[in-house]
């Protein structure tokens, strides 16, 4: 999909997962 799903990668406790795996919602990645 797209980065619009990454609503809080920067604030996510494991936000790096958003960058590694791609467009993961912070609700899931965090």
UniProtKB/Swiss-Prot annotation:
BP term (GO), one: killing of cells of another organism
InterPro entries registered for this protein in UniProt: Subtilosin_A
Name of one Pfam family that matches: Subtilosin_A
Thermal profile of function: Thermostable, retains activity after heating at 50 degrees Celsius for 24 hours. Activity decreases over 70 degrees Celsius.
GO cellular component: extracellular region
pH dependence: Active from pH 3.0 and pH 9.0.
Location of this chain's protein in the cell: Secreted
Record keywords, A-Z: Antibiotic, Antimicrobial, Bacteriocin, Secreted
Function noted in UniProt: Bacteriocin that inhibits the growth of several Gram-positive bacteria, especially the food-borne pathogens L.monocytogenes, B.cereus strain ATCC 11778, B.cereus strain ATCC 21366, B.cereus strain ATCC 10876 and B.cereus strain ATCC 14579. Likely to act by disrupting the pathogen membrane resulting in leakage of intracellular constituents. Does not inhibit the growth of Gram-negative bacteria.
Family that this chain belongs to: Belongs to the bacteriocin class V family.
Name of the featured protein: Mejucin
Upper classification of the organism: Bacteria, Bacillati, Bacillota, Bacilli, Bacillales
